[in-house]
Structure formats: structure tokens, C-alpha cells
């Protein structure tokens, strides 16, 4: 369990509940000092202050997505909350958006580094967490939460993951928890940051798309207009294209051939 400065306590509590329920040995380590030393929070806050100069101690933040269901290009907004509860939002330019995301991605990558440390010392494999929608739509960090030796739920839609949790008799607090990135200091659902649809509707949309269902069929299933259904399909296609490189392995400049003209691992 690897919380940090912006993690909500409920996530750590649910993690403890799950490992105890399943009888899994675990360690708990706060990675905030590591992130601080790497400059994670400093780089992030510098970019936030470029948009909101007053941002400082006691403020909170998150990034939200807009545009995908209306036919417009997706764009991201920075939302901040002052210590007295006032909320402000502003559309992000590319430079500051990329810096905030790059700094935030330290969190997933530091966690994965620690996972592989323990895997190495115990001679274990690292198990990944992306579900089908996350894997298909590129909602993971390359060499972060997207890195694993085995990905046992990458073929399961989110609703199926919830069903699996109930089959395993995990506590209801876990089974009823809403998906969250738990990455930003303000409460943020995955639909706010990436999908622009609640997870259950996103499951239906991706299943419909993968099954070749018409936009009219998707519109009927979700209770929306055909135009909006087409926007959702277009957004699915766009995310597949723009995140394809997250799935790419490292590419050698020259072919590395082993016996029988096959890559060494297959020779």
C-alpha cells in the first residue's frame, strides 16, 4: 500500500481491508518524501501557479475533461479550491497541462518501482490492475500502473470487475466504491478526468463499439441522442489512436535476431 500526500484515507483503508480479506501479506509505505525529493509536487505546483498565481499551501487541485460528448475537441480544465472553499476553474494550455500530468505521473512510476523491488527480492511477478476500458482507452501511465508481468483483468469491463469483487466476497465498502484516480487532492472521478462518461455507461459504449453496434443502438441503450452516441464512438476511436504508443515496447534501432531468424526470446 503506497499512499502519498494527496491520497484520501479511504483508499488506504480499503486497501487494508482487501489484503486482510484475501489473506495477502503486505507492506505500507508513504511515498510522499520520495516524490518530494524528485520534485513531483514542486513541478506540479509551478504549473498550477502559472494559471492561478495565488495557489499555495492549503489549496487543492484536479484536472477535468470537457468536450467529448458534445462533438467538440476534448480539452482539459484545471480546477482549484482555496482554503476557504472557493472553487475556480480555467482551461489549461498544452504546456501547463503536460507539466502537471508529467509531474503527477511520478506517483504511478514510483509505486511501480517499489512493486518491482519487492517482486525482485521475493522472486515474484508483478500483477497489473488495468481493466478492459482502461487498457483499451489508454488510461494508464506507461512504465507506471500500465507496467506488469501479468494483467489478469485487462479483458474485463469495469462492471465485471465489480461482479468479481462480489464473487470474492470483498467488503461492501470496496464493492460500492466509485472509481477514482486518487491522484489529485480534490475528489475526482475517472469520468471527470478521462472518459467524460460514468464507468457503467462507458462499459456499455465500449462493448457496443467492439460489437459493431450502430450509433442508434447505443443511443437507445444509454437513453441519449444518436448524435451524442456518434460523438462517444468518435472519442473512443480518438483515444485509441492518441494512446497507441503507450502499448508499444521499446523499439530497437536494428533487428535483434537469434537462432532461426527469430527474436532471441523465441529462438
Identify what each model region corresponds to.
Residues 1-5:
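Short, proline-centered helix/strand-breaking motifs
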Residues 9-13:
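Conserved strand-to-helix beginnings and helix N-cap segments that scaffold or border functional pockets
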Residues 6, 17-34, 38-107, 113-125, ...:
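ATP/NTP-dependent adenylation/nucleotidyl-transfer catalytic domains that generate, transfer
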Amino acid at each position: 500500500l503506497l499512499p502519498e500526500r494527496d491520497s484520501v484515507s479511504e483508499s488506504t483503508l480499503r486497501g487494508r481491508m482487501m489484503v486482510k480479506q484475501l489473506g495477502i501479506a503486505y507492506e505500507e509505505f508513504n511515498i510522499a518524501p520520495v516524490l518530494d525529493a524528485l520534485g513531483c509536487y514542486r513541478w506540479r505546483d509551478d504549473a498550477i501557479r502559472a494559471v492561478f498565481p495565488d495557489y499555495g499551501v492549503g489549496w487543492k487541485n484536479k484536472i477535468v475533461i470537457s468536450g467529448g460528448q458534445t462533438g467538440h475537441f476534448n480539452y482539459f480544465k484545471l480546477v482549484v479550491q482555496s482554503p476557504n472553499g472557493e472553487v475556480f476553474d480555467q482551461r489549461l494550455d498544452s504546456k501547463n497541462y503536460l507539466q502537471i500530468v508529467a509531474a503527477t505521473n511520478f506517483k504511478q512510476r514510483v509505486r511501480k518501482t517499489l512493486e518491482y523491488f519487492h517482486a525482485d527480492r521475493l522472486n515474484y511477478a508483478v500483477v497489473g490492475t488495468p481493466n478492459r476500458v482502461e487498457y483499451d482507452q489508454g488510461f494508464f501511465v506507461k512504465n507506471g500502473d500500465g507496467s506488469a508481468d501479468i494483467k489478469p483483468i485487462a479483458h474485463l469491463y469495469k462492471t465485471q470487475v465489480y461482479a468479481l469483487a462480489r464473487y470474492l466476497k470483498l467488503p461492501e465498502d470496496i464493492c460500492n466504491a466509485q472509481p477514482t484516480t486518487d491522484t489529485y487532492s480534490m475528489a475526482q472521478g475517472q469520468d471527470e478526468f478521462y472518459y467524460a462518461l460514468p464507468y457503467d455507461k462507458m462499459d456499455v459504449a465500449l462493448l457496443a463499439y467492439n460489437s459493431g453496434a450502430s450509433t442508434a443502438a447505443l443511443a437507445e441503450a444509454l437513453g441519449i441522442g444518436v448524435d451524442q452516441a456518434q460523438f462517444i464512438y468518435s472519442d473512443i476511436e480518438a483515444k485509441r489512436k492518441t494512446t497507441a504508443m503507450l502499448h508499444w515496447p521499446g523499439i530497437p534501432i536494428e533487428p535483434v535476431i537469434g537462432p532461426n531468424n527469430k527474436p532471441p526470446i523465441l529462438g
